[in-house]
Amino acid sequence: MSLEDLFERSVEALRERGVLFAVAGGFAMDLYRREPRLTMDIDFAILTKTGDVGTATAIVESLGLHAGLAREADLAGGPLFAIRRRSTRPCMIVGRPAENPSGEGVDLLLPTLPWVASALKRAQANNVDFGFGPVPALTIEDAILSKLHALRRLRAKDLDDLQSIFEAQREIDIPFLAGQIHSFAIDIPRQAEPFLPDWLVKLSHAADRSTRGRHKP
């Protein structure tokens, strides 16, 4: 099955189960990047009427993929004790071919990720035709927020997505973005700051100062 076929089948499976969803990840980033990039999987942010983990697992398995669960500590890279004890919340169901764990697949991002719930609501008015009809997709602001949240892992592709989006010089609702950065207390890693716009780094610093101020006795 091609990645495009898997994309369409995934959308059908999500709709059949009445799941609120939006295209995220590489396909969403390509809507706003200066140039497209290669992606090996399809990401959807989701919100279900029942248990998110159970429904997401069933959807992935209905596509003929093996379902794995990623927790907050897994994505953040630690702390090690949290990974071992599985003490942090599930935040993603990872679907990959059982015979090829590094092959093309589907990732379902759960609302335990702080940006997902609000991004899903905004995406319902941002429909994009990926070749098989209109599908909700992350707005440019929420695409940026998703990548800023992922930056703590310091993956090259997350930083590259952000750089390419800003290089494209598309219109961005900066007041909204500033409010969400403050609300989610997004802290840009120092190593990434030189590669991002100064105004964005300043927003992150302001959010960090505000968070520290709230925590003072």
Q: Could you say what each language-model-derived stretch is?
A:
Residues 1-217:
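Compositionally biased terminal segments of proteins
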